[in-house]
Amino acid sequence: MTTISKKEKEVLRKLATELAEYASLPIHQQKADMWKCLNGLEKVKPMIWMNEIPWHELGPEVNSIETTSELCHRQEKRIRQLIYQWKYMPGDMVLEPVIVCPLVIHDTGFDVLPQLKNAEGY
């Protein structure tokens, strides 16, 4: 089971607060509406979406990860990437005020295992 330290919580909360501030800007709703129009085949300006970014080459602002647990490390890295992209190369990206968390499943091993039999009954 992953234990999140107090320092990791502080780091993630600080980054999440910054992300939420950027995501609350009205430009994101405007960009989302433009993407909907484009996907609905309406005429809008050409939209720019950048998704192939060499993150490992961009320096300490995006690559200085302060958390150590695997779950926090992934979340911090993703939030830093979103903030960096918004600050320096936003294109027509839409920041949403949500953080997607992976599903965490812990198997205790105390479950009922299926009894499998082959065609001969063994």
Report each predicted region and the residues it spans:
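Catalytic cores of TIM-barrel enzymes
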Residues: 1-122
